[in-house]
Amino acid sequence: ANGAFTVKPGLGRVPAWNPSQNSERGILAQSMSVQGLLTRDPSDLDLAMPILSKNDPVDPFHVPLPYDMGSRNSKCKVALARETPGFETHPEIYKGLELAADALRDAGHEVVEVDPPLILETAMAGYRALMGEVIELLGPDIRKFGSSEINRIFDEYFKQFKPYTGTDLLKILAKRSYYAREWSIFLTKY
């Protein structure tokens, strides 16, 4: 609701690789890495995304699909989610959501207010797993190279999202498919 337009496509749609990295990223960092653009208008997105998503063999997970996968003229059902468990939402955010919902309705789309599946459980499991990966793979570098403020921030992350470790980390990584499945089913409806 700020006048900018963006697309953050799913994993593999835009190739990603950081040539300055000293070691490979953890599995969660790899699977959450999505690249996209922030543009002035949708036509800028349409101009740039086909270039951004061209094949690059340095990303072994890139899927070279065309950016435009079909007609945008079909009407769809759109989920409007207001739930932000554990966080207070500013009234201006709700106003922006209503403006967006009204614009979608005016364009002929069906807007349905829903609660996304398992949002708090998914978020907590994801953050705790990520913190488990971070503390093992990046923890020494955070402590060595991070400022006191960065270290304080990560200490707070580790406190709020107690890192999964050992077998618990492996089990929650396996459970990612359960959460992904629930969201996949949800996203086929909206």
Q: Where does each model-flagged region fall?
A:
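Short low-complexity, flexible loop/linker segments enriched in glycine and/or proline
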Residues: 2-5, 121, 125-131
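Acyltransferase
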Residues: 89-116, 138-148, 169-190
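Short helix-loop capping/hinge segments that flank enzyme active sites or metal/cofactor-binding pockets
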Residues: 72-81, 128-184
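Alpha-helix boundary/capping residues
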Residues: 11, 21, 51-55, 145, ...
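Short connector loops at secondary-structure junctions
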Residues: 109-126, 158-159
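A short helix-breaking turn/cap at a secondary-structure junction
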Residues: 5-100, 118
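Short coil/turn connectors at secondary-structure junctions
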Residues: 2, 74-75, 189-190
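Charge-dense, low-complexity intrinsically disordered segments
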Residues: 32, 36-39, 87-91, 121, ...
